[in-house]
Amino acid sequence: MPHAHPADIDGHHLTPDTVAAIARGQRAAIVPEPVLGKVADARARFEQVAAANVPIYGVSTGFGELVHNWVDIEHGRALQENLLRSHCAGVGPLFSRDEVRAMMVARANALARGYSAVRPAVIEQLLKYLEAGITPAVPQVGSLGASGDLAPLSHVAITLIGEGKVLTEDGGTAPTAEVLRERGITPLALAYKEGLALINGTSAMTGVSCLLLETLRAQVQQAEIIAALALEGLSASADAFMAHGHDIAKPHPGQIRSAANMRALLADSARLSGHGELSAEMKTRAGEAKNTGTGVFIQKAYTLRCIPQVLGAVRDTLDHCATVVERELNSSNDNPLFFEDGELFHGGNFHGQQVAFAMDFLAIAATQLGVVSERRLNRLLSPHLNNNLPAFLAAANEGLSCGFAGAQYPATALIAENRTICSPASIQSVPSNGDNQDVVSMGLIAARNARRILDNNQYILALELLASCQAAELAGAVEQLAPAGRAVFAFVRERVPFLSIDRYMTDDIEAMAALLRQGALVEVVRGAGIELA
């Protein structure tokens, strides 16, 4: 059900969360009348300048390396339509419906600032499509990230004039013209500058990035939830999350929030050993000896102890990336731009380097989130590390039964895959367009890489979650779990039974990964009275 209050597309106050909500159909979008008035005024002033027959890029000139060609303004519509048709050359699988809708919202917001000098009708057509559920079919491959996301945005823009293809409800595509006829929607007739303004910007990478920020936010919370359950399965310690060590000693905001979450998730657990208890046990075992092994570890391995330092750093990275994306979202990333004082700016605001860097950074952070999860999974399964639990958490007939041995392999493989994918796309500039575009950002590639890593992580986390539940049950410790842990355990067991004998596991893993994609564990612990930061 859509949010009661539509979101304003005003060019200045849009947030990534709001873009995600509109993209997912949870909220409607409107352009306030004063904004449309400002856009109309800007267009009128721009038309006065253009009428003076002065050279304006993309209005009275060719595009890119063809800029030296004078084009009479009488050919304005043909020039814009030719631009869209020629740049509808994307290839590969299509972006999802939500991703394309996010692109459309981002582009509408950039145009709503007024500096791109389009008519209000252009923005209104984008919003009309959003409201009607008409979503362009946009191939994923083809953007260089400067001049913006030309190829994917061309596949969006071409549908506004009744050409190209749109997505159907069954996941296929249909000619835009047919769909518009069925809906009674009139195609837009472009005027000069408007085709260029629709595609010459960063709205594809920015729109996709808005969704990725939301995904990582839920993922880091669920990583903390699963880590807490793994700690209980291994009978570890919560002392490493003491507030003093974070709030006072190392006050990175993300680390502080992560440590607070771990304290909340582990509160009232009877499965954990404190530093005082471990110290006393060490002294008892040592007796009068001055140098002797006791078998008591008063500190645990880093994957159990440094959760706030690692996941907190992921949180801080997420915050930084969100700042960059929100700033880009509310920017005029077009060329040329036209200002209230009559100045024309021929520049390069279409360059997506900021978003490209941010998405590469997000990909690196997400990769490390997966790494620490996989290492805890290894600790749960290894008979040398799992606190005397059965090897590979096999419930019976160790040796005859393999337990979770095979389930570790996809997690290990996905870590290697993530490490390969997270190599920065933002440094992979390849000159193009007759060396006019001689340095490009590859920002949409960076966003697509980050998306793939985040999806891989859902499987890694699902495996850690299943192993943690198995460990708690094998240890006979379910009733000793913290309230959060018991709630999560019950949620999992309602869907995936205890691994008593070896069985086909793919369906179990897929089921858990699907629930993690929905952010299900955040709601589970909320139901247990815990609101995570």
From Swiss-Prot:
Keywords annotated in UniProt: Isomerase, Lyase
Catalysis performed (reactions): L-tyrosine = (E)-4-coumarate + NH4(+); L-tyrosine = 3-amino-3-(4-hydroxyphenyl)propanoate
Positions where 2,3-didehydroalanine (Ser) occurs in the chain: 147
One Gene Ontology term of the molecular function aspect: ammonia-lyase activity
CDD domains attached to this UniProt entry: PAL-HAL (cd00332)
Keyword Chaperone tagged: no
UniProt cross-link 5-imidazolinone (Ala-Gly), position: 146-148
Binding site for substrate: 87, 200, 305
Active site per database record: 57 (proton donor/acceptor)
InterPro entries xrefs: Aromatic_Lyase, Fumarase/histidase_N, L-Aspartase-like, Phe/His_NH3-lyase_AS, Tyr_aminomutase
Enzyme Commission code(s) on record: 4.3.1.23, 5.4.3.6
Record note on modification: Contains an active site 4-methylidene-imidazol-5-one (MIO), which is formed autocatalytically by cyclization and dehydration of residues Ala-Ser-Gly.
Entry keyword annotation includes Isomerase: yes
PROSITE patterns associated with the record: PAL_HISTIDASE
Family matches, as PANTHER family: HISTIDINE AMMONIA-LYASE (PTHR10362)
UniProt family annotation: Belongs to the TAL/TAM family.
Function per UniProt: Has ammonia-lyase and, to a lesser extent, aminomutase activity. Catalyzes the rearrangement of L-tyrosine to R-beta-tyrosine and S-beta-tyrosine. Does not accept L-histidine or L-phenylalanine as substrates.
Subunit description: Homotetramer; dimer of dimers.
Protein name (record): Tyrosine ammonia-lyase
Native species: Cupriavidus metallidurans (strain ATCC 43123 / DSM 2839 / NBRC 102507 / CH34)
Source lineage: Bacteria, Pseudomonadati, Pseudomonadota, Betaproteobacteria, Burkholderiales
